Design a protein with these regions (language model features):
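N-terminal, polar/charged subdomain of small-to-medium soluble alpha/beta proteins
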Residues: 1-270
């Protein structure tokens, strides 16, 4: 790999307040805070700019910032996917790009909000750029019985659940922008992220497990089988498991096929 392949220009933490589909209270026309990160890999790297100390040979992030503000400000968007399309249309030519949009208050049940990402990379075989799309719901607050110790079997303890979903960007964007539900197409930026978070809380509350591994796997099953995603990676933090650490926990990733080919157990209830 060329040394210039890792050269990047970025903007972090662009803050806007606009309509990007339903807010956490499911109101379709209410503005909400959004945070945007942009990463660009320049087509010819940054060598020329470094050698000549000349900004004309690089991507001017000052101009990029002004262009993004002009494109996004004073607009409303049907959903986050629509916003990402407008942002990506504003980007200069680059070898690769990454766009991440965070809704810090987009989900009532998730203290860490929800983040959507779009990253391009060229196929090794044909050179055609493919866009990987991710959705991360962070810090879903839950309480349940989980653990082997006697005291853990008596009282529910607080858990923080984060869900990471990844796939190739859906090609049916006209249908998505028309409001087709997650049950019809698997785009990751529809308001189904709220339904995912709420269903996790509903299932976990009142459940009982001896291991956090079993609980995380059960949540993977819920996200893939019930919500139709091809894969899910679930992280569970147990802040009160060990007094001397901030949190203990696990991360488990499973595909929908994993559960389709075996008789996995249901959510265990107390």
């Amino acid at each position: 790999m060329s040394s210039t392949a890792v050269d990047q220009v970025f903007l972090k933490g662009l803050k806007f307040e606009t309509v990007v589909g339903p807010d956490a209270w499911h109101r379709p026309t209410k503005s909400q805070p959004i945070e945007v990160d942009i990463v660009l890999t320049p087509t010819n790297g940054l060598d020329a700019a470094a050698q000549d100390d000349n900004v004309s040979y690089t991507i001017d992030y000052g101009k990029l910032y002004k262009q993004l503000v002009a494109s996004v400000s004073k607009q409303s968007f049907e959903n986050v996917h629509h916003l990402s399309q407008v942002i990506r249309a504003s980007l200069p030519e680059a070898r690769a790009f990454g766009v991440h949009v965070r809704l810090p208050k987009g989900v009532l049940a998730a203290d860490g909000g929800v983040t959507f990402g779009w990253e391009s990379h060229a196929s090794v075989s044909d050179g055609i750029a493919e866009i990987t799309q991710t959705m991360i719901i962070k810090g879903i607050a839950c309480r349940c019985i989980v653990g082997l110790n006697p005291h853990e079997r008596v009282e529910k303890q607080k858990l923080e659940v984060s869900i990471h979903i990844q796939g190739v960007e859906n090609r049916l964007s006209p249908a998505i922008l028309a409001g087709v539900s997650m049950d019809t197409v698997s785009d990751l930026s529809t308001p189904a992220y709220q339904a995912v978070a709420n269903s996790v809380v509903e299932r976990v509350e009142g459940s009982s497990y001896e291991t956090v591994e079993a609980l995380a796997t059960a949540i993977c099953q819920l996200v893939t089988i019930n919500h139709g995603f091809d894969n899910a990676r679930v992280t569970i933090d147990k802040p009160y498991a060990i007094a001397g650490v901030f949190a203990a926990g696990v991360t488990i990733g499973r595909s929908k096929a994993y559960f389709e080919n075996k008789d996995f157990w249901k959510i265990k209830r107390t």
